[in-house]
A protein has these predicted regions:
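Active-site/acyl-donor-binding loops of N-acyltransferases
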Residues: 1, 72-159
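Amide-forming acyltransferase catalytic core, primarily the GNAT-like/NAT-type
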Residues: 1-80
Length: 159
């Protein structure tokens, strides 16, 4: 377990992770360079997980908010990477707050997890004809548009 990585490594891990989602933000090396600069301020922290070959297999960005340990972003290739990173940051804290997509089902990995649903995203389709043409769909409402997605959304962004 380490607390450092290069911007290119973080981007590569992110791109591998988002393959499992239909909705996500496009990021580049500059995004991660900005993030790494912010981490030097000490408000947020980074923990990484690497496999036996030294390849980055996941990272967590977390911070203390009042008395709570809050994971701001969790990117991982396998559940073991997530488990080990969470164990690393838990330390003497009693609990960790993590926001994930509904499809990630962390309660299967962490049996004592208490899932809570929270709505936090709003979407607007500016041109239904264009949307329907691009996605070969017949959506008339945002709810219908979301229904055509085959993978969950992953929309966590700071910069």
């Amino acid at each position: 377990m380490a607390h450092e990585a290069e911007a290119k490594e973080l981007l590569k891990a992110y791109r591998q992770f988002i393959r499992h989602f239909d909705g996500y933000y496009e990021r580049d090396v500059a995004y991660y360079e900005t993030l790494l600069k912010e981490l030097t301020l000490g408000i947020k922290q980074l923990v990484t997980y690497r496999d036996a070959h030294g390849t980055l297999c996941g990272y967590l960005i977390y911070q203390m908010q009042k008395n709570d340990l809050v994971v701001k972003e969790a990117v991982y290739m396998e559940s073991i990477a997530l488990q080990r990173m969470m164990k690393e940051i838990l330390g003497d804290h009693e609990a960790i707050i993590v926001e994930v997509s509904q499809s990630e089902k962390l309660e299967k990995i962490f049996t004592l997890a208490i899932p809570k649903r929270s709505a936090f995203m709003m979407a607007r389709i500016n041109s239904y004809p264009l949307f329907n043409k691009l996605f070969n769909a017949k959506a008339k409402t945002p709810k219908e548009a979301y229904a055509i997605l085959k993978k969950p959304l992953w929309l966590h962004e700071y910069y």
